[in-house]
Amino acid sequence: MRDAIIIAGWTWEAFNIPERLALSMALLGSRVLYCANPVSSFKEKECPVKELEPGIFGFTPRIWGHRLNQWSFTAAMQSRTIADQIARHAEQLKLRDPIVIYPYMARILPVCAELRRRGFHMVYVVMDHPQTNLQAHVALADQTLVVQRTSLHPLRAQLGDKVHFLPELAPSLSYQAELSGQTVEHPALARIPRPRLVYAGVPHGRVHVGLIREILTARPKWHYVHIGPPDGLELPNSHALSWIPKNMIGQILAGTDVGFMPYDCRIERDFNCAPLKLFDYFAVGLPVVSTPIIYLWEMPDLVYTGDTPAELIRAVESALTEPRDGPVRARRKEMAREHSIENIAELLGRVLPING
């Protein structure tokens, strides 16, 4: 059984695709080295590798500073420094012929080129479409995993069986059961009236603020909730919550009436996104209202969609009247289970050379 190195552009708490892939590889029996986003050694002292979850060991690479990447000489030196740290920790952990799995990040290509030069098996994960430097990354990688079908088929036409589809990763079955069984609302929701339309994440500029404003203005008794800094709506029925740790997301969902995903379909990246939060909603059977992003086209019976404010208002009205014990809620939960980390681990075991 080969081990794995996951290079992420976040921290472990983000619980994004790299973190879920780390959990999947650990389920297969691999020991995993998880590499968080590098930080400046002038800001933080180096910390030892620590065990994040059973079989998953994390560290944060140290560099001089991200600003130095604007010059090719110092950028190349910092890339080698990161590769050195990854290789050193892999050796200290006695990882067995580890596979390196990584998504797109700024300045990650030279790091991965250095690791490839040292003989590591490289697996690139295409998380967005369009993807910056896509051709350079797939040319470097031994294998490519693709989350969106928009990118999948052109890459398979080009590279054949080096490219594999990666279904979006829902939480583990045990975590889904925990989410579904949560009945206590998060205290931050106490001041927010119902019905609550919840975007269970940080928008990062990916939602259509104009659409949201028109909906909230037309329906002042509906309340939009998201996590992270204020979004500029400045409406009494728009609410921004401070950071919510992963173990409290269930409390947010317990107080949610509609899972709300008003992505901006005018932007190609957002039109092609594959939102992880969808499966958090599905895990508890919540009705979901969204703009019609491509990822949802295969599940029209599970999600309410609309392009315009009027269509989305009707979609929310339908979602709010959906029976709580109806069969559609059970089907959502079943789809979340199909996408569980356990099931994706089985897929990875088939497509990655983990047995030697």
State each model region's role:
Residues M1-E46, L216-T217:
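N-terminal subdomain of nucleotide-sugar transferases
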Residues W12-N16, H204, N247, Q251-I252, ...:
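Nucleotide-sugar-dependent
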Residues L21-S24, P171-G255, L278, G306-T308:
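Conserved catalytic-core segment of nucleotide-activated headgroup transferases in glycan assembly
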Residues G29, D257, G285:
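A short alpha->beta transition loop at the rim of the catalytic pocket in nucleotide-sugar-dependent
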Residues Q85-E91, A113-E114, M127-V147, S151, ...:
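Membrane-proximal helix-turn-helix segments that form the acceptor-binding/catalytic region
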Residues T150, E168-S172:
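Carbohydrate-associated surface elements
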Residues V184, T321-P353:
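A charged, aromatic-enriched C-terminal amphipathic alpha-helix characteristic of glycosyltransferases
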Residues L302-A310, E317-R324:
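Conserved acidic donor-binding segment of nucleotide-sugar-dependent glycosyltransferases
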